[in-house]
Swiss-Prot record:
Name of the protein described by the UniProt record: E3 ubiquitin-protein ligase ZNRF1
Record pathway: Protein modification; protein ubiquitination
GO CC terms of this entry: cytoplasm; cytosol; endosome; intracellular membrane-bounded organelle; lysosome; membrane; synaptic vesicle membrane
Assigned EC number: 2.3.2.27
Length: 227
């Protein structure tokens, strides 16, 4: 009896779909890119992280190079998985790319929200959930000035900043309360008889220490920011 021939097995690294082959080299003349390369340029070819994200969205990784920027909805799981898997009925590596990416292994396959695909060269992430994207984009349509708290259009932001920063700080008169005067809206404590207060030109009154701290950041009355 001769020695049993061993079947050459594909080495598997700690992460599915990532090659640990020493022969993995970047393409000649190409810029370094996150992903893995295999000499010979066979079926495995270049698979970048963005391709994995495309697979997670239910699209064929083999056509990822032609996927444009846009909005996509992940295909439903279940019976359709076999149809979505690239090279259905083929090698285990194809199945790994259809089901072994982090998107589906962590339960992301059940996420029904659409995805905003940012392209293969996107920084930080290849796709953003649509329930996050609107909030990110809406923050660029307007601006809340940290000095006067007014909402300013994006195209007027620079001019508004110049006006706010060059605007002189309000002056006030020191005074001592002769009777209780309600609540100081800065510290939310009562203005009591005998407290040293600051009286602004708009006749609003605050604790002197409170308004001094307020004017270190702001240049307007807390209750009349438009003045």
């Amino acid at each position: 009896m001769g020695g049993k021939q061993s079947t050459a097995a594909r080495s598997r690294g700690p992460f599915p779909g990532v090659s640990t082959d020493d022969s993995a080299v970047p393409p000649p003349g190409g810029a370094p890119h996150f992903g893995h390369y295999r000499a010979g340029g066979g079926a495995m070819g270049l698979r970048s992280r963005s391709v994995s994200s495309v697979a997670g969205m239910g699209m064929d990784p083999s056509s990822a190079g032609g996927v444009s920027f846009g909005l996509y909805t992940p295909a439903s799981r279940g019976a359709g998985d076999a149809e979505r898997a690239p090279g259905s009925g083929g090698s285990a590596s194809d199945s790994t790319y259809a089901h072994g990416n982090g998107y589906q292994e962590t339960g992301g396959g059940h996420h029904r929200d659409g995805m905003l695909y940012l392209g293969s060269r996107a920084s930080l992430a290849d796709a953003l959930p649509l329930h996050i994207a609107p909030r990110w984009f809406s923050s660029h349509s307007g601006f809340k000035c940290p000095i006067c708290s007014k909402s300013v259009a994006s195209d007027e932001m620079e001019m508004h900043f110049i006006m706010c920063l060059s605007k002189p700080r309000l002056s006030y008169n020191d005074d001592v309360l002769t009777k209780d005067a309600g609540e100081c809206v800065i510290c939310l404590e009562e203005l009591l008889q005998g407290d040293t207060i600051a009286r602004l030109p708009c006749l609003c009154i605050y604790h002197k220490s409170c308004i001094d701290s307020w004017f270190e950041v702001n240049r307007s009355c807390p209750e009349h920011p438009a003045d």
